[in-house]
């Protein structure tokens, strides 16, 4: 699937949610078990996901991906995800 700014944002969320655990497990042992290590691991996973998505880098897109990686099982995230139904990446990132 080729991802563009016109792609439905829920497709990108699904891609991120499905690939995050594997990337996390792959990189987990390469970072120390500290807050700094956890932050570095999160940055590495977000960077790998951005490469996988293959859109031009933007701070907003990186922040969006980081939010999905850090908060996947919260009520607030579920409500946020529900509010994105029918929107494109362009709608979410540039609004």
Residue ranges with predicted function:
Residues 35-37:
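Short basic-aromatic helix/loop recognition motifs at nucleic-acid
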Residues 81-95:
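Amphipathic alpha-helical binding modules
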Residues 39-49, 89:
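Short, charge-rich amphipathic interface segments used for partner binding and complex assembly
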Residues 4-32, 51-79, 91:
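Amphipathic alpha-helical oligomerization segments
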């Amino acid at each position: 699937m080729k991802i563009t700014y016109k792609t439905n944002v829920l497709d990108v969320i699904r891609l991120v949610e499905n690939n995050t655990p594997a990337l996390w497990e792959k990189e987990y042992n390469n970072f120390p078990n500290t807050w700094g290590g956890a932050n570095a691991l999160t940055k590495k996973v977000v960077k790998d996901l951005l490469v996988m998505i293959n859109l031009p880098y933007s701070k907003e897109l990186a922040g969006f991906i980081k939010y999905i990686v850090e908060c996947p099982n919260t009520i607030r995230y579920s409500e946020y995800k529900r509010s994105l139904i029918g929107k494109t990446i362009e709608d979410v990132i540039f609004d």
